[in-house]
Amino acid sequence: MPEQLTNVITLARHADAAPFRRLVEEHGSPLLVLDCDAMRRKYRELRAALPTVGLFYAIKSLPHPDALATLAAEGASFDVATSGELDLLRGIGVDAAATIHTHPIKRERDIRDALDFGCKIFVVDNIDELAKFEAFGAQARLLLRVSFRGKGVVSDLSRKFGCEPGAVPWLLTDAARIGVPVIGLSFHVGSQWPDPAAHVAAV
């Protein structure tokens, strides 16, 4: 038996392996199988658990058009970071009002592409990024990303992204000076954190 088929059998009970074997025979291995029904169920579970929270799917985690279309049909919003990701959303007809741009470093072209698409909300965490929005004024709305250092997190993104809390007043003052509205704060507690209380502590 070919090695890739042996690997498939180790991932599922023998009785359930037949469809995976056929997929590997047809498409080769390694192979990512996307179950849109499972995505739909998980999204609904999360929405039911957090009924008052807007849920934004980070496209970079799995930028497959079928995944995006499945979530869009469920009413999900989207976290975009590149013009290419905006093109994916444009291709499936996503409402631009359901998007937020979170890339920490943006070129003027990136900002313009997002605004042309209709994405109005951006995340910034330093004075240099803030200055890039002076040319766009009130066309854009900003969230200030604050550094939140959590103990025990596997991937601590606040080591390199986010301003110190003490810098927030300075950034607010400068945003007001250049006429760009700040509508809130943003933070990332990190990934692969087994304790849900970490999110509570961050809030």
Placement of each model-derived feature along the sequence:
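Active-site loop/helix belt of alpha/beta enzymes
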Residues: 148-203
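ATP-grasp fold ATP-binding core
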Residues: 141-147
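A charged N-terminal "starter" segment
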Residues: 1-135, 139, 172-173, 177-182, ...
